[in-house]
Amino acid sequence: MNGTISVLLAGGGTAGHVEPAMAVADALAALEPGVRITALGTERGLETRLVPERGYALELITPVPLPRKLSGDLARLPMRVRRAVRETREILDTVHADVVIGFGGYVALPAYLAARRNRVPIVVHEANASAGLANKVGARFARRVLSAVADPGLGRVEVVGTPVRSSITELDRAALRAEARAHFGFADDARVLLVFGGSQGARSLNNVVSGAAKALAAAGISVLHAYGAKNTLELPDPAPGGPPYVAVPYLSRMDLAYAAADLAICRSGAMTVAEVTAVGLPAVYVPLPIGNGEQRLNARPVVETGGGLVVDDADLSPQFVADTVVPLLTDTGRLQTMTAGAALSGHRDAARHVAHVALDVAREAAGGRKGVR
């Protein structure tokens, strides 16, 4: 280490991998002025847009998607891995990396293998309740293994939460509420339901909540619904003087959305749970009904602290909204209890914690002084 710490972030592909990496990048820059930050990605991932937007350097390698079934891709996998590892080793040398922080996904696997070959220390962060293949490999030779939850299947881990952007972790919902409600056209004293299904929306959530629009309006509940840019939403004609149902394809200001809402209906991807709990927003989580069940596991900690409910996608219906969500939204005491439970399970300092660990590891490996505080 030549005085300037160089960090390689391996978290490309989906927003669930890129966003935590960018949150940690921001924390690193705040903690260690002059730190050199490089993100690793591929031309296929969201990082090609998200990383430059945040002002960080991006280096691209050959994509190594892990096939989910037998195909020609499986036969080509070893060749792709070797090529991606070779490219990553060259990048590690070029940027003089002192530490690699991996967040899982197909960019992380070659990063871990290359770092091991180049003797660059590794820090692994797992956001999901069930770890994927890349992090299972990386955890075997990482200096530190950090996780959002206690048992993601990586052996001994340090629970730190999932890094989220500072606009969320620093959000004061109560202080911003009046501005947020004015922004979306809600009354100051409205009860507001926030509905969103991630960056692409969720058709089942869209159909169910829009199908319950009349029941929600009859109960005096306003709705803020992000239905996804690729989807459409059909709503009944509003009753004169009824509460607004604000439907938009995408919410560019999630901080305002969280501040305006009293309750959310959403999926339970790792980033969604991390953000919703960080701001202390009660939620009804509807796990995506595919994969290995990790979304249900992601929601378990907040359910255990009383900050949320879980309902299966197959059980979500307009009748469920009328029978369960409406009474919940009109019960001030229960909402207050759930708000406290959501905040209890949330982690607002995860990005800073991961950044501290990475800087410590880099300095320890270089024989420098321990600690950056």
Swiss-Prot record:
Binding site for UDP-N-acetyl-alpha-D-glucosamine: 14-16, 128, 165, 199, 295
Species assigned in the record: Mycobacterium sp. (strain JLS)
Pfam families hit by this protein: Glyco_tran_28_C, Glyco_transf_28
Function of the protein: Cell wall formation. Catalyzes the transfer of a GlcNAc subunit on undecaprenyl-pyrophosphoryl-MurNAc-pentapeptide (lipid intermediate I) to form undecaprenyl-pyrophosphoryl-MurNAc-(pentapeptide)GlcNAc (lipid intermediate II).
Membrane topology: Peripheral membrane protein
Protein name: UDP-N-acetylglucosamine--N-acetylmuramyl-(pentapeptide) pyrophosphoryl-undecaprenol N-acetylglucosamine transferase
One Gene Ontology cellular component annotation held by this UniProt entry: plasma membrane
InterPro entries tied to this protein: GlcNAc_MurG (IPR006009), Glyco_trans_28_C (IPR007235), GlycoTrans_28_N (IPR004276)
Top-rank taxon, per record: Bacteria
Pathway listed: Cell wall biogenesis; peptidoglycan biosynthesis
